[in-house]
A protein has these predicted regions:
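RecB-family 4Fe-4S metal-dependent nuclease core
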Residues: 1-233
């Protein structure tokens, strides 16, 4: 059976091999694992529906289109959350729809990508999720919506691993290269983009190779003390 790997797993291993062992080999989960965000889920579903179901016969949808979609995903929200979400969508509309000449139908919305990699006679099943995949002139842009109240950019080495994993998976799935990974912070209307290169793919292959070696040799998963110990312990 293939060994499951994801961006979160790679980032955990990079931070601390022993934390990886505790969480994924021994099944010990942190309290944060059980968190849930109904408002964030509703926003993601609304934007997925808005881009998926828009007819694209006109250059741009009206704001009412987003609100119609929003109304279909608010049943589990409080009135305050529903109003908060409406304001967030208004910010999104002004920054990412009304400011464009036209919007184009994405390759896909709110989906999963899967790929495989063979290392040291071990098969790794690579899995990831995305909010939207857009076409670029020379490849693909993967868009990830963030509904957190604070803008917290990922560390450079961790975003590099995420980019590399998606690069590898999208190349297998669509035969196209990832050129850009973009984070859209819904509450502020800010977009942060990272270029994707073949070097990111090579980085992920190297890290997966290290995991394969540890699994094969059954050697100690060395701890890497740091700030992650507070949340992983």
């Amino acid at each position: 059976m293939a060994y499951q790997i994801s961006a979160t797993k790679l980032q955990t291993y990079h931070r601390c091999p022993q934390a990886y062992q505790f969480r994924y080999e021994l099944g010990l989960k942190t309290n944060a694992f059980f968190g849930s965000a109904a408002l964030g889920t509703a926003l993601h579903q609304t934007l997925a529906q808005a881009y998926r179901d828009w007819h694209y016969q006109e250059p741009l949808p009206q704001m009412n289109w987003l609100l119609d979609c929003w109304g279909q995903h608010t049943d589990s929200l409080s009135p305050a959350q529903a109003e908060d979400g409406k304001q967030i969508l208004e910010i999104y509309y002004q920054n990412f729809i009304a400011s464009e000449v036209a919007i184009h139908k994405p390759l896909a919305v709110e989906g999963k990508i899967q790929a495989s990699l063979q290392v040291a006679n071990l098969e790794f099943a690579i899995a990831g999720r995305y909010d939207r995949l857009d076409y670029l002139d020379n490849g693909l842009e993967l868009i990830d919506y963030k509904s957190t109240k604070e803008i917290k950019l990922p560390k450079e080495d961790e975003i590099d691993l995420q980019i590399g994993l998606y690069y590898l998976a999208l190349e297998q799935r669509y035969r196209q290269s990832l050129r850009k990974l973009s984070l859209i912070y819904l509450r502020t209307g800010e977009k942060v983009s990272f270029d994707a290169t073949p070097e990111h793919k090579q980085l992920v292959e190297t890290v997966i190779g290290k995991i394969a070696w540890q699994l094969r040799t059954d050697c100690d998963w060395e701890p890497q003390p740091g700030e992650q110990c507070v949340s992983e312990a």
